């Protein structure tokens, strides 16, 4: 199974899609991640600095990047322990192409 982790800046809730006027980009990201889980053998997790700081600290590569660049480096998208994007959210098509190009860790 492919592992996707999205490290994000501090937000009011786990997805940032809350309140009366959620950010359109975060709505699109949430929909893209849901679609990926339905179409691919992928386990998606999201870590935001306010609610999941332990995930940032436990992943040395992410902790080092945030320490060096500050939170402006976020979001960071990691697929199977490899950073595939930083400082931007990927679209559904961009995310899907990373799964098509990346071998399943169980098959490698």
Swiss-Prot record:
InterPro entries: Arsenical-R_ArsD. Coiled coil: none annotated. Disruption phenotype: Deletion of the arsADRC operon results in increased sensitivity to arsenite and antimonite but not arsenate. One of its GO terms (molecular function) is DNA binding. One of its GO terms (biological process) is response to arsenic-containing substance. The keyword RNA-binding does not apply. Pfam families: ArsD. Induction: By arsenite and antimonite. Gene3D superfamilies: Glutaredoxin. Keywords: Arsenical resistance, DNA-binding, Plasmid, Repressor, Transcription, Transcription regulation. It comes from the Archaea. NCBIfam families: chaperon_ArsD (NF033727). Trans-acting repressor of the arsADRC operon. This is Putative arsenical resistance operon repressor ArsD. It comes from Halobacterium salinarum (strain ATCC 700922 / JCM 11081 / NRC-1) (Halobacterium halobium). The lineage of its organism: Archaea, Methanobacteriati, Methanobacteriota, Stenosarchaea group, Halobacteria.
């Amino acid at each position: 199974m492919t592992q996707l982790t999205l490290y994000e800046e501090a937000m009011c809730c786990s997805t940032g899609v809350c309140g009366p006027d959620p950010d359109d980009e975060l709505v699109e990201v949430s929909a893209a991640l849901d679609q990926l889980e339905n179409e691919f053998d992928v386990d998606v997790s999201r870590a935001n600095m306010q609610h999941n700081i332990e995930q940032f600290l436990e992943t040395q590569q992410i902790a080092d990047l945030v320490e060096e660049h500050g939170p402006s480096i976020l979001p960071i998208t990691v697929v199977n322990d490899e950073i595939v994007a930083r400082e931007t959210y990927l679209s559904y098509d961009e995310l899907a192409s990373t799964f098509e190009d990346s071998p399943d860790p169980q098959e490698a």
